Amino acid sequence: MSATLLEGAPIADKIKEDVKAAVAEIGRVPKLAAILATDNKGAEFYAKSQGKACEEVGIEFELHQLAADASQADIETKIAELNDNVAVTAIILLMPVPAGVDGRALQRAIDPKKDVDGVNPVNIGGVVQGSTTLAPCTAQAVLALVEASGVPLFTDPKEAQGKGTEVVVVGHSEIVGKPSGLLLLDKFCTVTVCHIGTQDLKAHTTKADVLVVAVGVPGLVKGEHIKPGATVVDVGINRVKTDDGKSRIVGDVLFDEAAEIAGQITPVPGGVGTVTTAMLLKNIIDAARLQGHRSPGPLKFPGNLGQSAPGGRRVKLQ
């Protein structure tokens, strides 16, 4: 079987269109403030990409660069300053933070209404109750892609009875694995979460109608791990060296093998990451509305996008 590509661009484009319209409705230009306290090149690149994404939809972006050896107090002071600044709609703390700094304490310090990364305990608690208003962006991206795949998802328990989709999430991080599982549980999926302690990964993954992989290990999931016809959502973004000494980006799923078995599969790049960026923009709009800006209600990302992958195309393997 050759799988259909479940591409992120059609979903992301629709979200960006909605965000542009929302910016016009709000009555003031939202602003994202990013805090960078590292010289990590990946974090610097991510900050630049955030700025570019904001610019595309009319959201202001400002980068607050702190020293790579900034102290806990230095970063907490900056967070407090941005919390109190009414011109700042949204705050994101880029990782990693300096050695010896308590990242979780910093996440707790961000005003929950400005926490567009969805890492403050208040917003994580919202995920437990099924809210996507300021849920972690990648978890929202996973849900959007699963919805776009057309697998059965439900909001009504009577309709869901005995019909829930079998989902396996590989990885239990606080910003991807756990919240993805919770959001899918809220759609009456039967969710199994696997992690480093799982004794027989294959025994679990081959039962999955939807397989979500988010561990940061290139090629961990192979064709043998996948149920024929399953939907595979590959969250991993890993840079690996090629035989010619260069590098390329790959996921956590061994793509060529998986595409022969799966029914639908997200590409890397071009899948989850693309939608995650759009969800950050969506969260900025939600933050603006939570802070009392014009236009009530959270922005709805495009759910139920059809019974097949939007813009999906078959993967022809040689």
Q: What is each of the regions a protein language model found here?
A:
Residues V29-D39:
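Short beta-strand segments enriched in small/hydrophobic residues
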Residues S2-T4, V275-Q318:
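C-terminal helix-to-coil terminal segments
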Residues L93-G162:
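Anion-binding alpha/beta catalytic cores of soluble intermediary-metabolism enzymes, centered on
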Residues D74-V86:
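Short, well-structured alpha-helical segments in soluble
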Residues L106-I124, G236-Q291:
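Rossmann-fold NAD(P)-binding glycine/threonine-rich loop
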Residues A37-G51, T133-T231, V235, V240, ...:
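Glycine-rich phosphate/diphosphate-binding loop of Rossmann-like nucleotide-binding domains
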